Structure formats: C-alpha cells, structure tokens
C-alpha cells in the first residue's frame, strides 16, 4: 500500500519536474534572443498577455466566439452526418458513392478546406462554420454507416417476429445497437472539429488580409 502510494507520488513529482524544466528551457531560449520577441515570447510575457486579456474581457469574448463556432459547426455536422451514414448503410449505391467520397475526404488535413472556404464565403462566419462542418461530417458518416452495417441481423428479425415495423426497428433496435460506433465517430468528429476550427481561425484572416 505504502509502496504504491510513494510510487504514485514519485510519478507526480517526475511530471512536475519535467514541466518546470520545460518552462525553464523556454525562458532560457527566450533570454538568448535568437528570435524576435513577437515570434518567441517568454513565459512571463505570455502570462502577462493572458492576464491582461482576462482583465479587459477580451479573452472571455474570444473564447465565447470560438465555442459558439465549434458547437454550431459540430452540431450541423452531426445532424447531417448521422442520417447520411444511415443512408450509406441502407443503400449500396449511396455507399459506393458518398461512402467512398467520405473515406477520401476524411483523410484530408483540415487546413485544406480553408482556401475553399475563403473563396466561397470570404472572411465571414460562414467560412469558419464550413471548415468545422467539413472536419466533423466525414467521420460521423463513416462511423454511423459502419456501426449500422455491423448490427447482427438477428436483432431486427427478432423484433419483426414480435410485430415491430421498420421505423420501430430502426429507432429501438438498429440505432441503439450501433450506438458504440456512432459515439466513437462523434468523439473523432469532435477532435477534428477542434482542429479544423483552429486552422480556420488562424488562416482565414491571413488569406483575406
């Protein structure tokens, strides 16, 4: 018991020492002035900027705008992606077309959508939302389609023998059985949505001047 306790404290101490060394190395490199201060600020300068941004409310405002973009884009991606994934699992033609497109687009880095968003929407909220939706959509489509295809057919047959109709089977049998796959796709879509939004917020203002 005591040995495990000291082992846990030792792991925490190692982590703390590591981060202290990282901050010290950061400060040391900053003091060397190899790079301009605006390219490589010191930890103290970063802390001061964050503190002043928090005090004047700009940090809170920027965080709220970012979260609003993220939640809205992610929500649209889910509302669009889950039904499309269901269609892919149900119809082979859609799987052979939209499914393949989704597989290809999912592999694209999020930043690839930024130039298109800028050309189509300019420096607007629409450009930001488009990039976030594209980051979310494809993972959700693929996960939903894969999950519904992997539901054992015996589940639906058992429900139909008890008088369940197609809609009831879909809502109460197929969707719950495929939930682990769908949730996994939602998690991946959330991670990709964050990554997409970061790329959009950095590059859209740059590309539009």
Segments from the language model and where they lie:
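Transmembrane alpha-helical segments of polytopic membrane transport and secretion proteins
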Residues: 1-20
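Generic hydrophobic transmembrane alpha-helix motif, especially the helices
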Residues: 103-139, 146-147
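Transmembrane-helix boundary motif in ABC transporter permease subunits
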Residues: 72-102
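Hydrophobic alpha-helical elements at and bordering transmembrane segments
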Residues: 50, 59-63, 67, 97-104, ...
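Periplasmic/extracellular loop-to-transmembrane helix junction in inner-membrane transport proteins
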Residues: 2-3, 32-75
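Glycine-rich helix-loop "coupling/hinge" segments at transmembrane-helix boundaries
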Residues: 118-120, 148, 196-209
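Transmembrane alpha-helices
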Residues: 130, 134, 166-200
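Short cytoplasmic-facing helical segments at TM-TM junctions of multi-pass membrane proteins
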Residues: 143, 147-182
């Amino acid at each position: 018991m005591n040995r495990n306790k000291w082992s846990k404290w030792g792991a925490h101490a190692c982590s703390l020492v590591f981060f202290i060394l990282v901050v010290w190395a950061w400060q040391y490199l900053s003091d060397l002035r190899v790079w301009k201060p605006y390219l490589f600020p010191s930890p103290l300068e970063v802390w001061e900027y964050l503190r002043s941004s928090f005090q004047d409310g700009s940090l809170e405002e920027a965080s709220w705008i970012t979260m609003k973009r993220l939640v809205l884009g992610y929500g649209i991606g889910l509302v669009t992606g889950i039904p499309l994934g269901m269609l892919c699992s149900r119809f082979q033609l859609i799987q052979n077309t939209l499914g393949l497109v989704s597989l290809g687009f999912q592999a694209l880095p999020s930043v690839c959508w930024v130039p298109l968003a800028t050309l189509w929407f300019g420096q607007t909220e629409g450009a930001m939302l488009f990039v976030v939706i594209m980051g979310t959509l494809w993972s959700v489509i693929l996960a939903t389609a894969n999950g519904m295809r992997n539901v054992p057919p015996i589940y639906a047959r058992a429900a139909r023998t008890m008088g369940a109709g197609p809609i009831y089977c879909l809502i109460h049998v197929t969707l719950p059985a495929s939930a682990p796959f769908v949730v996994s796709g939602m998690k991946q879509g959330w991670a990709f949505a964050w990554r997409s939004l970061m790329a959009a917020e950095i590059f859209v203002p740059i590309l539009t001047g």
